[in-house]
């Protein structure tokens, strides 16, 4: 990520929007919490954000404040990673490792389970990390040839609400990295930002996202159905396997509740009219492109 180029592009976007009377000032705002920062503070206090997180194949595409970056990383992002890891652990992929517990008559022994390229299983036990008496008991009386032992994965922290917030955050920042503040500065999106920063309460209706084998390429798609006027953001999470995510972010003309109602009523073989957001439009530096996107977001005409 070219941080200086990114900052200059965002400043140009803010300058144009300020001249159009859309925003109150030209100060950079963290896209997640909308806190304002001076030019000096942007360089010092904003950090590069991987979208999706680096552990799931993401790249640095945005700048967020240290508070949002840290909070998201330690709360919602880890839940999304653990959800993917948990799915893949069930498949026992070759050349992978995981932490497990051995359980025998109420005694627990921690270990690392290694699955080699031929899918043979090997237990690696770190004696220093276990109770010495428990380890002695396992070594001398339990871990015998052909012994039956209950093997359990170490539980991973997973919360559906936090996973949902992480999926929304990724889509929101992908859209922001493409369009800047052009329309996302609207207070309409405060609820979306609040849902990301405070996942537990139901601020937005469920569900604006889906995890399916989507046939279209990653990208941002404009929906041509006015009932769902907004953006389908499609992206991929990568671990051992790849997982396609599609998130719908409505335009300010479409209430969130109405959007989820129409999304729920889409049948398996229904066709949704969409078009890829044209790559040749520069929503940071070209006033005409910014005006055109805003007209589409706040009106009902074609893009």
Enumerate the predicted regions with their spans:
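Short Cys/His-rich Zn2+-coordinating modules
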Residues: 5-19, 44-51
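Short, flexible, mixed-charge glycine/proline-rich loop motifs
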Residues: 15-27, 53-59
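Short cysteine-rich clusters marking metal-coordination/redox-active sites
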Residues: 30-33, 65-68
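Cys/His-rich microdomains that often coordinate metals
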Residues: 37-39, 69-72
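Histidine-centered nuclease catalytic patch
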Residues: 37-61
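Short microdomains enriched in Cys/His and/or Lys/Arg
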Residues: 52-67, 86-99
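Polybasic, low-complexity binding patches
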Residues: 72-115
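C-terminal, charged low-complexity interaction regions
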Residues: 136-303
